[in-house]
């Protein structure tokens, strides 16, 4: 190495400008060394941090590979070959992790320690000495300046001694500090070379040691293992490429074949309806009620499984039972202005669901499939052939149910056509009960023969016009089977203390001959249910029944419009079915025609959600409350009448007392007028005014009238 530049320590006492200039060069060199070594320290520290991170990451990788066999993967989790291969890799990588850990330790000792010691000890020592030298130099200059200003004329031994002592102390301090400072700067020229070379030497030795350990660990067995793994990876890659090519071809074929199916409602000529299905799956919109008038439609995947209709929401692992469709009824319905809707009703009528298909084809296929399953065709040996024989009934279910007027006109007998004596008029809106064919015991004493049955609530009765009523029935009968009568526009239930709401479905109504025994309700239920079964009428109008102390109201769940109002005093009988407590009915007594004396009774039958007895109890409670309210009203009116009589008697008594008071006043005046006559006889005279004379005349007249009375 070339010679080392040095500062002359022997010239520190002289402190010449040349020495100071040379000191400035060494200080500039020290500053450059400090900046460069800081950058080199940061670079080596990054190497050390990276090596530590590599060691930790390698160890973590080995740990994760060991835990692979403990993982539970949904697919391919039981691959023993993969597990054993990863275990072997884990061992090799764990050995590499140990080598990296050794390398990290060597880098810390051989590379980071020397450069850190130079940075933290030697460079900081130079900075400290520089600051101390600067302070000592300033103090020496100040002492020399004070010594130079000593007065020649006015010498003061004490001041001179103090200044001289100050110069001595400051010069000594500067000299000593400067010598140590020069020594440190001269030593720095050696230390900077050591600080540069020693960390690099340690780094290279650590790397060589690391590579030697790696070479020792890499044996022939490991090379063979890596070669086998490379071959396996190439085989898997070739298999993947082949599978990708097959899937791409399948995608292209499916895109061409499925193009017409992208349309929501495909052409029925290209994709005809299959009416012989006994299994079906696909997405449907299900109607769910969220309130009295609100509802939501949820899209779910539905599929049939034997005699069950299953539903599965997106994200669910498995499907759940939506409805038992054995012996169920299915029909197309109109719901909330949506297309392709159909309703499924369970065999017992307790549960019903409204679903919406995506297309007309799906709509008809779902109805046909459910209709086939409901007849248990899927249990036969050849379900498709059996389903073909019942296709006609499925087609009838696809067509939406006609209205009451249409069904009535379609089923009305033609003019001049004879009918059996026991037959009754048959229609979906007005049908005969046909009791002779449906019951062994005739109850004509309760229900008149040939009585029409009303199955639909055609339209609500207008309640805004007083005295208005609708006439139903046949043969010119001007009756109101729903018991509607005119009333004021004020709500009848505003002040009612009882408000109970129930969900009911209207089954039918018919006129009855008696209203004094529950058998009337039972017989009406029997005839209406039998007529519905004969004519395959499954649709029921759902309403909300509001029970108050004034009336019973049927309210439309969708629009909250009152369909029918039954005055509570006209409800004379109510009862539930003896076996099926969901069925209940009541008899309404109304005036028939224009004559108030001609009364008729109509029985209404409803189905509820296991609340038949509760509804009857609520009606009974409403009638009791109404009865007590009527009694209280009558008692209040009677009390008011008594108070009016007492008030009238009190007024008469007060009037009589006033008359008596007036008579007493008149008598006093008459007595006063008789005193002057006595005084005149004694020679004294009293002059009466004209007013007093008039009062006396009035008093005499009053006495005359009293005596005459």
UniProtKB/Swiss-Prot annotation:
UniProt name for this protein: DCC-interacting protein 13-alpha
Subunit structure: Homodimer. Binds RAB5A/Rab5 through an N-terminal domain. This interaction is essential for its recruitment to endosomal membranes as well as its role in cell proliferation. Binds DCC and the catalytic domain of the inactive form of AKT2 through its PID domain. Binds PIK3CA and subunits of the NuRD/MeCP1 complex. Interacts with OCRL and INPP5B. Interacts with NTRK2. Interacts with APPL2; interaction is independent of follicle stimulating hormone stimulation; interaction is decreased by adiponectin in a time-dependent manner. Forms a complex with APPL2 and RUVBL2.
Every PH domain range: 277-375
Gene3D superfamilies per UniProt: Arfaptin homology (AH) domain/BAR domain, Pleckstrin-homology domain (PH domain)/Phosphotyrosine-binding domain (PTB)
Compartment(s) where it occurs, according to its Swiss-Prot or TrEMBL record: Early endosome membrane; Nucleus; Cytoplasm; Endosome
Tissues where this protein is expressed: High levels in heart, ovary, pancreas and skeletal muscle.
One BP annotation, GO: positive regulation of melanin biosynthetic process
Source organism of this protein record: Homo sapiens (Human)
Job of this protein: Multifunctional adapter protein that binds to various membrane receptors, nuclear factors and signaling proteins to regulate many processes, such as cell proliferation, immune response, endosomal trafficking and cell metabolism. Regulates signaling pathway leading to cell proliferation through interaction with RAB5A and subunits of the NuRD/MeCP1 complex. Functions as a positive regulator of innate immune response via activation of AKT1 signaling pathway by forming a complex with APPL1 and PIK3R1. Inhibits Fc-gamma receptor-mediated phagocytosis through PI3K/Akt signaling in macrophages.
One Pfam family in the UniProt entry: PID
Effect of residue 94 to N: In MODY14; no effect on protein abundance; loss of function in insulin receptor signaling pathway
Region (Disordered): 397-434, 467-491, 645-709
Phosphothreonine: residues bearing it: 399
Topological category with respect to the lipid bilayer: Peripheral membrane protein
An annotated Gene Ontology molecular function: protein-containing complex binding
A cellular component term, taken from the record's GO annotations: early phagosome
Basic and acidic residues composition bias: residue spans: 645-667, 700-709
Domain (BAR) ranges: 3-268
PROSITE patterns (UniProt xref): PH_DOMAIN, PID
Domain PID: 496-656
Sequence motif: F&H, positions: 403-414
Keywords per UniProt: Cell cycle, Cell projection, Coiled coil, Cytoplasm, Cytoplasmic vesicle, Diabetes mellitus, Disease variant, Endosome, Membrane, Nucleus, Phosphoprotein
Phosphoserine PTM positions: 401, 410, 693, 696
Post-translational modification: Phosphorylation at Ser-410 by PKA severely impairs binding to OCRL.
Bias (Polar residues) ranges: 674-693
């Amino acid at each position: 190495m070339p010679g080392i530049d040095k500062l002359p320590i022997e010239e520190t006492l002289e402190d010449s400008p040349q020495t100071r200039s040379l000191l400035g060069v060494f200080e500039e060199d020290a500053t450059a060394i400090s900046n460069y070594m800081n950058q080199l320290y940061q670079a080596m520290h990054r190497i050390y941090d990276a090596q530590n991170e590599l060691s930790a990451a390698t160890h973590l990788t080995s740990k994760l590979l060991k835990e692979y066999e403990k993982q539970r993967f949904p697919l391919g989790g039981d691959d023993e070959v993969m597990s054993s291969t990863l275990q072997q890799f884990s061992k090799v990588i764990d050995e590499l992790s140990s080598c990296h850990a050794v390398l990290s330790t060597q880098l810390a000792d051989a590379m980071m320690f020397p450069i850190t010691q130079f940075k933290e000890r030697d460079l900081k020592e130079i900075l400290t000495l520089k600051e101390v030298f600067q302070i000592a130099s300033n103090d020496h200059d100040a002492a020399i300046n004070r010594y130079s200003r000593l007065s020649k004329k006015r010498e003061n031994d004490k001041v001179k001694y103090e200044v001289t002592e100050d110069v001595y102390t400051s010069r000594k301090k500067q000299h000593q500090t400067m010598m140590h400072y020069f020594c440190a700067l001269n030593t720095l020229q050696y230390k900077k070379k050591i600080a540069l070379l020693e960390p690099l030497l340690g780094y290279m030795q650590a790397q060589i040691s690391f590579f030697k350990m790696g070479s020792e660990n890499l044996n022939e067995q490991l090379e063979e293992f890596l070669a086998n793994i490379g071959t396996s990876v190439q085989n898997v890659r070739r298999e993947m490429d082949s599978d990708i090519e097959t899937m791409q071809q399948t995608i292209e074929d499916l895109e061409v074949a499925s193009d017409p199916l992208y349309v929501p409602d495909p052409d029925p000529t290209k994709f005809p309806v299959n009416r012989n299905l006994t299994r079906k799956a696909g997405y449907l919109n299900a109607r769910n009620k969220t309130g009295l008038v609100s509802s939501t439609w949820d899209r779910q995947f539905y599929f049939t499984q034997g005699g069950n209709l299953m539903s599965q929401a997106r994200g669910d692992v498995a499907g759940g039972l939506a409805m038992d469709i054995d012996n169920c009824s299915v029909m197309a319905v109109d719901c909330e202005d949506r297309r392709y809707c159909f309703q499924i009703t369970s065999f017992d009528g307790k549960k019903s669901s409204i679903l919406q298909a995506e297309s007309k084809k799906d709509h008809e296929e779902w109805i046909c499939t459910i209709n086939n399953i409901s007849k248990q065709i899927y249990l036969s040996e050849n379900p498709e052939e059996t389903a073909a024989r019942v296709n006609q009934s499925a087609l009838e279910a696809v067509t939406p149910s006609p209205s009451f007027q249409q069904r009535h006109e379609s089923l009305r007998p033609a003019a001049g056509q004879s009918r059996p004596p026991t037959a009754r008029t048959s229609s979906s809106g007005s049908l005969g009960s046909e009791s002779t064919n449906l019951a062994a015991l005739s109850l004509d004493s309760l229900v008149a023969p040939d009585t029409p049955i009303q199955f639909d609530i055609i339209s609500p009765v207008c309640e805004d016009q007083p005295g208005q009523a609708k006439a139903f029935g046949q043969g010119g009968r001007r009756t109101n089977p729903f018991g509607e009568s005119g009333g004021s526009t004020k709500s009848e239930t505003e002040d009612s203390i009882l408000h109970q709401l129930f969900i009911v479905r209207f089954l039918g109504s018919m006129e009855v001959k008696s209203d004094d025994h529950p058998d009337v309700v039972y017989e009406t239920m029997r005839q209406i249910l039998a007529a519905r079964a004969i004519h395959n009428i499954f649709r029921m109008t759902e309403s909300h029944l509001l029970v108050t102390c004034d009336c019973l109201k049927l309210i439309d769940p969708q629009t909250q419009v009152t369909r029918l109002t039954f005055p509570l005093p006209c409800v004379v009988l109510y009862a539930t079915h003896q076996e099926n407590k969901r069925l209940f009915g009541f008899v309404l007594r109304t005036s028939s025609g224009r004559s108030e004396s001609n009364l008729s009774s109509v029985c209404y039958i409803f189905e509820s959600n296991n609340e038949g007895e509760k509804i009857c109890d609520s009606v009974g409670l409403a009638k009791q409350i109404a009865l007590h309210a009527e009694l209280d009203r009558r008692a209040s009116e009677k009390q008011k009448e008594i108070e009016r009589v007492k008030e009238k008697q009190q007024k008469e008594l007060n009037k009589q007392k006033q008359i008596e008071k007036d008579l007493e006043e008149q008598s006093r005046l008459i007595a006063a007028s008789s005193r002057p006559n006595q005084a005149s006889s004694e020679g004294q005279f009293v002059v009466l005014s004209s007013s007093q004379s008039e009062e006396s005349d009035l008093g005499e007249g009053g006495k005359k009238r009293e005596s005459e009375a």
